[in-house]
Amino acid sequence: MSKLGSLVRERILILDGAMGTMIQQYNLTEGDFRGERFSQIPGQMKGNNDLLCLTRPDVIQDIHRKYLAAGADIIETNTFSSTRVSMADYHVQDYVREMNLAAVRLARKVADEFTSLTPDKPRFVAGSVGPTNKTCSMSPDVNNPAFRALSYDELADAYREQMEALLEGGVDALLIETIFDTLNAKAAIFAAGQAMETVGVHVPLMLSVTVSDIGGRTLSGQTLDAFLASVQHADIFSVGLNCSFGAHQLKPFLEQLAARAPYYISAYPNAGLPNSLGTYDQTPADMAHEVKEYIHEGLVNIIGGCCGTTDAYIAEYSSLIAGATPHQPVPRPENLWLSGLELLEVKPENNFVNVGERCNVAGSRKFLRLINEKKYDEALSIARRQVEDGAQVIDINMDDGLLDARTEMTTFLHLIASEPEIARVPVMIDSSKWEVIVAGLKCLQGKSIVNSISLKEGEDKFLEHARTVKRYGAAAVVMAFDEKGQADTYERKIEVCERAYRLLVDKAGFNPHDIIFDPNVLAVATGMDEHNNYAVDFIRAAGWIRKNLPGAHVSGGVSNLSFSFRGNNYIREAMHAVFLYYAIREGMDMGIVNPAASVLYTDIPADILERIEDVVLNRRPDAAERLIETAERLKAEAEAAKTSGGERQAAAHSQLAWREGTSVEERLKYALTKGIGDYLEEDLAEALKLYPKAVSIIEGPLMAGMNHVGDLFGAGKMFLPQVVKTARTMKRAVAILQPVIESEKEEGATAAGKVLLATVKGDVHDIGKNIVSVVMACNGYEIIDLGVMVPAETIVQHAIEEKVDMIGLSGLITPSLDEMVHVAIELEKAGLDVPLLIGGATTSPLHTALKIAPVYHAPVIHLKDASQNATVAAKLMNPKTKEELEEELHEKYRQLCEKNREKQVTTVSLEEARKNKLNLF
């Protein structure tokens, strides 16, 4: 471990402040920047601060000395813009190596002087590596979104040139800072690895990102969680935040980073926010007061300053950190992290990750035609529709003999980057050509999936590909394929997968969670007996992999299974539903599917289900013949209807059978479950005649339908794309009822109370919250809806400003649980006394009792669904019933906590366990 590495564990370290702000105090002229040496170079040179390392080294050395005298442990080299890319603007790009070497020499000399004076307080030099003035993720031309002013390779080469000089000069660490585009940062990380190998020196790698807005995203659109996933492959020493805001505004994002990043945490905020003249008014004492919270709450290991800060600001830190406990990094995630603009964390409770299959020129004739004809807008609409239908990852394949696959992959990925609705999900780069995969990896700022690598060409090529995937920061699909060919039996599948796993983990240093095995979904019912057990072998292999290869995932191209039934979409989709039902139960947690598929396992008629299961599970020797008979019968019935001119009528009759002889409640439930919105107006009009108020329909049959969907999803009989369709249908139903709800409100009626609603930060799901909003409004409450992805500080701010009577927090995903706890803590800190209503798919009474209620003194109530909100709210608005409710909650939560404690396994020390060992002899 480096000296820097051991010291950061012992105490909080101080980083220096702004270089540019300090330089401004010297009132340097154009002549100072140019010196005699650069007097003939065209253009203005003033403002090129890095050049001062060559023309006014005395100034730079003096600034370093002031920061070290102020107490800094780490000073940065004056090389923020010292790359060939940035220096080209000043026509001095050919001097970047000399500039970097000079910058290190200046910083190193002063740092070593101070270390010799105080050996117990060693001083370090970090090589500053800025983001450059170009971006790899965005086009500078709004009319050409596929264009890039700079390629990944050009940027990586420029970074490597800079870093080699910094390492040769003797820096103690490399600091890639002010990251606004994660793809730029990934190029810098890639270059850092190359530079360290070339120079033969390995130093800690520090990253510092900057957020561009109060939503906490980078300029290129990523959330902080997505950023962490994108750089997870790197050997990171620290990660942090700089620039953007002052210490107060930066704190919520720092808290998020500290809670999620398994690294040391750094922060160097600006001196507050700039005034109208672009200067900073915050005093050193005021900034120190805000930074003090970072230190007291254990958020940081390294603290410094950015824009507007000087040595006077840094001098305030020594007294703040004296005796303070440094931040303890959180454990590394035990799940697969993927990202586009947002994080996709693949957890067991995710059930199944849908990889959209339609952006594949080999599998979609329509997509191939659009790419061939350069109709990229229409091709993008296919990707967008898949995301809307619930695809959590988008598979992209451009392998066609008449296409330049590398160019098309690059173009399409560049175009996706300009479409936030698509770019928010991770990408699976799918190609049989390695150069196409590498080209794709250079286009994506998020953490993608490579599809695929295998042992087909032997171990050496396999390891070479695996190391390349890792270096670019991606996960990998590993095909069950080796030198002998495709693994088609259970025994061969587990043999190849185990061998590949050991090579990846033991020799390539691959994160086990980034390994996604594809044990080969092969066609069944082909008429060849040796194919009959293909599905069973896959399902068994999936179970074996999940039990025996820790961390690894299982995926597959599901449509391959039903290849024998091309042309019969119903049978194919039904086969897929059956296969997934059994494969997911065994451990398959990802698959390339059509997210718009509509056949549910539970809706397959019993006779057809039996025959499909006979085939998929290989339960009888004549299974294929029997399913073929069924498929032919269905086809013949369709042909007969067509011949008699009644095809459309027959199809319509079949599709509308659910509407015959059923109650309006049953029809609404079915419509929600299937995501059918065509008859909502008709059915809701009928329901309005039966129910006293429109809100009663929401609380009754519509809520019953939503609960049924939840049950199916939880049982693995319904998947996310279908749930998304349900949510859209529910929104449409509520929108239809909304005018009626408004008209039913009594004129002049005063509000029963004021309710603030929000889906917590990190969660984009709003269907549950929207239903609660409607129900509460119908019951006379004034609603303040803050929307989705709402930070804790925004909730606190609006709760105070609006003087609300209660706050409702919603969340659908697991990370929302931790964020709800965080919101409760912030409400408590702010001194609020407002009841907190908790709801959402992942919430529970037990989590509320154990985690949320203990950190907030006001009532915290978990609500199962929207129908309970109005009743509970009414009790909270009445002082007498509120007191009774609080007593009920206290007793209920006490019992829940007690039962939970009884379930916990009591552990003993290792020494005591050894004393209790079973003695057989």
Residue ranges and their predicted role:
Residues 1-921:
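Domain-level signal for soluble alpha/beta catalytic cores
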